[in-house]
């Protein structure tokens, strides 16, 4: 994910990883942001 205004929080809707906030990635199964394993 990326640190930008309007980034999606955990379980927020997404289509790509960069829709999500830092440390989150887009889960293509559920189309929401989930933790990507980074700190």
Curated annotation (Swiss-Prot):
Keywords: Amidation, Disulfide bond, Ion channel impairing toxin, Knottin, Neurotoxin, Secreted, Toxin, Voltage-gated sodium channel impairing toxin
Gene Ontology annotations of biological process type: envenomation resulting in negative regulation of voltage-gated sodium channel activity in another organism
UniProt-listed InterPro entries: Huwentoxin-1
Covalent S-S links between cysteines: 7-21, 14-26, 20-33
Pfam family, one: Toxin_12
UniProt entry tagged with the keyword Isomerase: no
Domain characteristics, as noted in the entry: The presence of a 'disulfide through disulfide knot' structurally defines this protein as a knottin.
Role played: Inhibits mammalian voltage-gated sodium channel subtypes Nav1.5/SCN5A and Nav1.8/SCN10A by shifting the voltage dependence of channel activation to more depolarized potentials and by blocking the inward component of the sodium current. In vivo, this toxin causes erect, elevated tail, initial partial ataxia, followed by recovery over approximately 1 hour after injection and the progressive development of shaking. Although paralysis subsides, the body tremors never cease and persist until the end of the experiment.
Name of the protein in its database record: Beta-theraphotoxin-Cm2a
